Amino acid sequence: ACLGFGEKCNPSNDKCCKSSSLVCSQKHKWCKYDL
């Protein structure tokens, strides 16, 4: 399963939910909306 908003993630292995327009923040290391 992919990671939801605000979940901890690894920028080099981005598992955030692309279908929800989420990306792993390089700076904060959590999934945020790619606006």
From Swiss-Prot:
Belongs to the neurotoxin 10 (Hwtx-1) family. 10 (haplotoxin-1) subfamily. It is found in: Secreted. Negative results: has no effect on Nav1.4/SCN4A, Nav1.5/SCN5A, Nav1.8/SCN10A, and Nav1.9/SCN11A (IC(50)>10 uM). Keywords: Disulfide bond, Ion channel impairing toxin, Knottin, Neurotoxin, Secreted, Toxin, Voltage-gated sodium channel impairing toxin. Potently inhibits Nav1.7/SCN9A (IC(50)=98.1 nM), and moderately inhibits Nav1.2/SCN2A (IC(50)=216.3 nM), Nav1.6/SCN8A (IC(50)=313.6 nM), and Nav1.3/SCN3A (IC(50)=491.3 nM). Hyperpolarizes the slow inactivation, but does not alter the voltage-dependent activation or fast inactivation of Nav1.7/SCN9A. Binds with Nav1.7/SCN9A at the extracellular S3-S4 linker of domain II (site 4). In vivo, exhibits dose-dependent analgesic efficacy by reducing pain responses in rodent models of formalin-induced paw licking, hot plate test, and acetic acid-induced writhing. Expressed by the venom gland. Its main location: secreted. It comes from the Eukaryota. The keyword Disulfide bond applies. Disulfide bonds join 2-17, 9-24, 16-31. This is Mu-theraphotoxin-Ca2a. The presence of a 'disulfide through disulfide knot' structurally defines this protein as a knottin. The keyword Secreted applies.
